[in-house]
């Protein structure tokens, strides 16, 4: 009966017969909840470490990807530049070929003219020699 009157007053005895303000069942549940919370906090801490490691890994991979992307862009630009240089060089060579063809044609005309002059001079010399 004394226990009931103490219980009504909000006082309880635990398993060691110590006087407590909380009901022993509530105290036990509070202790269990406290341990579950501690386990939960530990798991959250571990989860944050794992996630932090994954974030670092993803950041590292993103940097490597960005570097490779920049290398690929540089290589593509270099290839475009080389193609443009080759095209310009090809145009220069075509222009040089056209110039050399024109020069060859002038030389051919000059050669034909000189051959004609030589033939005329040889004919003149032959006529001159025949007259003597």
Curated annotation (Swiss-Prot):
Coiled-coil ranges (or none): 87-112
Listed InterPro entries: FT20
Domain of life: Eukaryota
GO cellular component: centriole; centrosome; ciliary basal body; ciliary base; cilium; cytoplasm; Golgi apparatus; intraciliary transport particle
Keywords: Cell projection, Cilium biogenesis/degradation, Coiled coil, Cytoplasm, Cytoskeleton, Differentiation, Golgi apparatus, Spermatogenesis
Database matches in Pfam families: IFT20
GO biological process terms held by the UniProt record: cell differentiation; cilium assembly; protein localization to cilium; regulation of platelet-derived growth factor receptor-alpha signaling pathway; spermatogenesis
Subcellular locations according to the entry: Golgi apparatus, cis-Golgi network; Cytoplasm, Cytoskeleton, Microtubule organizing center, Centrosome, Centriole; Cell projection, Cilium; Golgi apparatus
Major subcellular site: Golgi
Disulphide bond pairs: none
Role played: Involved in ciliary process assembly. May play a role in the trafficking of ciliary membrane proteins from the Golgi complex to the cilium. Regulates the platelet-derived growth factor receptor-alpha (PDGFRA) signaling pathway. Plays an important role in spermatogenesis, particularly spermiogenesis, when germ cells form flagella.
Protein name: Intraflagellar transport protein 20 homolog A
Gene behind this protein: ift20-a
């Amino acid at each position: 009966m004394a226990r009931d009157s103490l219980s009504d007053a909000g006082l309880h005895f635990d398993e060691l017969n110590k006087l407590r303000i909380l009901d022993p069942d509530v105290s036990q549940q509070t202790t269990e909840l406290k341990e579950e919370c501690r386990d939960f906090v530990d798991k959250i801490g571990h989860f944050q470490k794992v996630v932090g490691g994954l974030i670092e890994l993803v950041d590292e991979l993103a940097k490597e990807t960005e570097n490779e992307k920049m290398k690929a862009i540089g290589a593509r630009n270099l290839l475009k530049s080389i193609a443009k240089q080759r095209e310009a060089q090809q145009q220069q060579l075509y222009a040089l070929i056209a110039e050399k063809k024109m020069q060859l044609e002038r030389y051919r005309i000059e050669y034909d003219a000189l051959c004609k002059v030589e033939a005329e001079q040889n004919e003149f010399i032959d006529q001159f020699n025949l007259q003597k």
